UniProtKB/Swiss-Prot annotation:
Mg(2+) 1 binds at D8, D140. Pfam families: RuvC (PF02075). It comes from Pseudomonas fluorescens (strain Pf0-1). This is Crossover junction endodeoxyribonuclease RuvC. One of its GO terms (cellular component) is Holliday junction resolvase complex. The lineage of its organism: Bacteria, Pseudomonadati, Pseudomonadota, Gammaproteobacteria, Pseudomonadales. The keyword Zinc-finger does not apply.
Length: 175
């Protein structure tokens, strides 16, 4: 049973979620939460994201990580900051030798809810149902858990077909 880390990156709040892939199409909740960076300088916030993700990896020991791709925001500055936070999380995962896969928000919603047009509340409710949670996780943590679930489902559909792991392709799997 593989431990999977899901990351919902943000320059102020980065959600994380860890699930155990049962290998039978299901996942078991392990942990979730948010890395909050406050309102400091961007380089300080990126350092907090990097250190926070690295600490989570060292604490729980996941072997693979799914992370959300950057979407095109109306505000270019916000998209750039989001991309930088993503980069900090990816470097933390790479330094800990995790295989890393990237997913669009639409792919995650499709995998968890069944439609790429789902809203955050629908994703949150399906995450609660799939992981048998008794209370609502924070939205950013819920999104990260959804990314981890998406990664578990994608891995299980790819790996049996002889496509290998992301590691065999240089550490990053783009889907």
């Amino acid at each position: 049973m593989t431990l999977i880390l899901g990351i919902d990156p943000g320059s102020r709040i980065t959600g994380y979620g860890i699930v155990r892939d049962t290998g039978r199409g299901g996942c078991i909740y392990v942990a979730s939460g948010c890395i909050r960076t406050g309102a400091g300088e961007l380089h300080e916030r990126l350092q907090i994201v990097y250190r926070g993700v690295r600490e989570i990896i060292q604490t729980y020991g996941p072997v693979t990580m799914g992370i959300e791709k950057v979407f095109m925001a109306k505000n270019a500055d916000s998209a750039l900051k989001l991309g930088q936070a993503r980069g900090a999380a990816i470097v933390a995962g790479a330094e800990e030798s995790l295989e890393i896969a990237e997913y669009t928000a639409t792919q995650v919603k499709q995998a968890v809810v069944g439609t790429g047009a789902a809203n955050k509340e629908q994703v949150q409710m399906m995450v609660m149902h799939m992981l048998k949670l008794t209370s609502k996780p924070q939205i950013d943590a819920s999104d990260a858990l959804a990314i981890a679930i998406c990664h578990a489902h994608t891995r299980s559909s790819l790996l049996p077909h002889g496509l290998g792991t992301a590691r065999s392709r240089g550490g990053r799997l783009r889907l």
